C-alpha cells in the first residue's frame, strides 16, 4: 500500500483531462464575474485603474502586495542591493568579518527605517533573553520569549512599544510587527539553543549578528540559531552550479511577480469575496474556484516574498528555509503551513519536543494544542485566529485518530483485501475530503467567516448532491496526480541513493 504504487497511464490521463477542464471552466466563470463586477460601487475601493489602454482595471485589495511591489518596491530593492554589494566586498576583502558586516548593515537599515528608539527597544528584548540564556533554564527562556512576544501582540504592551517608532509611513505597522515578532522568535531560538548546548558558550555578539541579518529581519523566513550560526561561520565557498540556481530562482521570482500583476487585471479574486451579495450569484464551479484561488494566491505571495529574500541569502552563502509547499499539493494537515521557517521553529521547540514521534493520541493532542497556542499568539489573538487555530488543531488530530482507527479492526481487514491500486484510490478519496477541509479551515483567516459560510453552504448543502460530488471528483483527480508526482520523486530519490551506494 506504499507510495510507489502505480496507476494505469490511461487512468492518470483521464484525471489530467478532468482536472484541466474543471479548472478552465471555473476560471472562465471567474473571468466573466470579474468583468461583470468591475464597475460595481462595492468594488471601487479595491478595483482601481490598471491597463487603461486595454480597458482593464486591477484588483488592489491586498495592501501588503501593493506596498511591497509598487509603493515601496524601489526602497526594498535599494536596501537589498546595498546589502548584496557590501556583503560581496566584505567576502572578497575580509571573509572572516562578513557576519559583522551583515549585523552592522542591518542595524543601520533598521535605524534608518524605524528610528534609533525602535532599535533600543529591540536591543532591550535581546538583552532579556540573552540573560535568560545564561541561566540555562529552558522553561524560563521559552516563558520569557512568549511573554516578550505577547507584549507585541496585545495591549497595553503593543500601544506603548509602537510609540518607539520614529515618523509615520504606510508600511510602518507591517515593519513594526514583523521586525518585533521575528526578533523575539530569533532571540528565543538563541536562548533555547544556548540551553541545549551549554558547552558552546554563545556570546551576545552572536545573538546580534543573528538577529540583525537584514534579509530575514522584517519578513523572515526565520532560521533557527543553530543553523544560521553554523552556516555563517563556515568559509564562504560556492559549490559548482549554485550560481546558476540562484539566477534561476531570481528569474522565477520576477516572473511570478509579473504573472500576479497580469492575473489581477483579469481576475478580482480578492475583491469579489468582500461583496457577499455579488459572490452569492456566482455559479457553484466559480465559487469553488474562487475559494481555491484565494489560498493559491496566499501561497504564491509567500513563495514570491521568500523567494526574493532567499535569493539574497543564497548569495550570502546561506541555505535558508524553502518556500512553503503549494496548497495544490496539500491533502494532509500535518504538511499544511504557509511559512516553512515558522513551521520549523514550532516543530523544533514545541511540537516535536512535546509530541515525540507523533504516533500516540494523547501526546499528539498535547503537542498540537501547545503548538497552536503559540501560533495564536504569533498571529495575534482575536476571534478569527481562535477559530482558525481550533479548526486546524482538530484537523491535525483527527487525521491521527482516523489513522489509528484504520490500523485496527474491520477497516484494516478490508484494506488488506484490496489491491494496492484500489487502496491508493480509496486513500486519494479520503485525501480529497481532507483537501477541502484544509481549504475551508484556512479560508476563515485568509478571507472572512461569512464568505467561508457561503462557500460551505453552496458546496455541501444547496449544491448537494451534484455540486458536492462533482467538486469531490475533480479534487480526487487532483490528489491522484499529486500522489503520482510524489511517487515519481520517491523513485528518483531511491535511484539516486542506489547510485551513491555503487559509487
UniProtKB/Swiss-Prot annotation:
It is a multi-pass membrane protein. It is found in: Endoplasmic reticulum membrane. One of its GO terms (biological process) is negative regulation of N-terminal protein palmitoylation. The chain crosses the membrane at residues 12-31, 65-87, 100-122, 127-149, 250-272, 287-309, 426-445, 460-482. The keyword Zinc-finger does not apply. One of its GO terms (cellular component) is perinuclear region of cytoplasm. Keywords: Endoplasmic reticulum, Membrane, Transmembrane, Transmembrane helix. It comes from the Eukaryota. The keyword Transmembrane helix applies. Negatively regulates N-terminal palmitoylation of SHH by HHAT/SKN. Interacts with SHH. Belongs to the membrane-bound acyltransferase family. HHAT subfamily. This is Protein-cysteine N-palmitoyltransferase HHAT-like protein. The lineage of its organism: Eukaryota, Metazoa, Chordata, Craniata, Vertebrata.
